[in-house]
Amino acid sequence: MQAEDLKLILASTSPRRRELLGRFGLPFEVLGVEVEEVPRCGEAAEDYVRRVASDKSARGQSMAPSDAAVLAADTEVVLDGQIFGKPQGAEHAREMLGRLSGRTHEVLSAVSLRRGDCHWQALSVSRVRFRDLGLEEIDAYWASGEPADKAGAYAIQGRGELFVAELQGSFSGVMGLPLLETARLLRHLGLGTARLLAGAAP
């Protein structure tokens, strides 16, 4: 498949995912989608993140041209089996960051790709250890506005990296779109790694 013949759609308005997918140098369009993002009773975090990513790509496919390939992702912070979503306010963010302080949590990023009747998925699992955080730091971070719309109330690509003592896994996965797993999925569209590397060159 020639890249110019491929209509690729990112079913997300996240600036982080748009930036990350853009690193491949492929043309793509952005489509905003809305799906229910509420864990089901007893649903494991890995199953949840896979389901939400799948729902997003399915929703995007229903809105896109029939020949388009639709890519979507979902990222969640998980501690002790509990999914940390986006903070509902300052107190919620303070609670989440306080619980993450000095501990290791997981960041799960599921990627879903659809084209026609085909559906492919991949999952990135990263482990992030926070240093001990002070309340003054947490309050100052919330005041910056950065954590307001971020899972787990922090952005590793921004000021939130100052909290990270150790990362095992994918930096881009923690950001919201794991590039290695995404590249593997794009192979199903005939886009090998060499093509993606060439496309990313200036």
Swiss-Prot record:
Q: Where is this site: Important for substrate specificity?
A: 16, 75, 157
Which residues are listed as membrane-spanning? none
InterPro entries reported in the protein's UniProt record: ITPase-like_fam, Maf-like
Q: Which cofactor does it need?
A: a divalent metal cation
Q: Where is the active site?
A: 74 (proton acceptor)
List, alphabetically, the SUPFAM superfamilies matched.
ITPase-like
Do the record's keywords include Lipid metabolism?
no
For this UniProt record, the keywords arranged alphabetically read as follows: Cytoplasm, Hydrolase, Nucleotide metabolism
Q: Where in the cell is it found?
A: Cytoplasm
One biological process GO term for this chain?
Answer: nucleotide metabolic process
Q: Give the Enzyme Commission number.
A: 3.6.1.9
Record CDD domains: Maf
Q: Which reaction does it catalyse?
A: dTTP + H2O = dTMP + diphosphate + H(+); UTP + H2O = UMP + diphosphate + H(+)
Cite a single GO MF annotation.
UTP diphosphatase activity
UniProt enzyme class: hydrolase
Q: Name one GO cellular component term.
A: cytoplasm
Spell out the family assignment given in the record's similarity comment: Belongs to the Maf family. YhdE subfamily.
What the protein does comes down to:
Nucleoside triphosphate pyrophosphatase that hydrolyzes dTTP and UTP. May have a dual role in cell division arrest and in preventing the incorporation of modified nucleotides into cellular nucleic acids.
Q: What is this protein called?
A: dTTP/UTP pyrophosphatase
